[in-house]
Swiss-Prot record:
Protein name: Conotoxin TeAr154
Secretion signal span: 1-19
Statement: the UniProt record of this protein carries the keyword Disulfide bond: yes
Tissue expression from the record: Expressed by the venom duct.
Intracellular or extracellular location(s): Secreted
GO MF: toxin activity
4-carboxyglutamate: residues bearing it: 57
Pro-peptide region(s): 20-47
Organism: Conus textile
Length: 61
């Protein structure tokens, strides 16, 4: 029974802490979607290079 008030206080602090932004947004912040797009295009370019270069070296550029 002595742990219940401590548990309730910790629960309330945890729930209220989720809504607080830890770091304000700056102009340098980039959306995650652009990182995904860059990764996807890089992977596609590398896969194309791996698949065609042994057959046709002109596509390696």
């Amino acid at each position: 029974m002595h742990c219940l008030p401590v548990f309730v206080i910790l629960l309330l602090l945890t729930a209220s802490g989720l809504s607080v932004d830890a770091r304000p947004k700056t102009e340098d912040d980039v959306p995650l979607s652009s990182f995904r797009d860059n990764t996807k295009s890089t992977l596609q370019r590398l896969l194309k290079r791996v698949n065609c270069c042994p057959i046709d070296e002109s596509c390696c550029s």
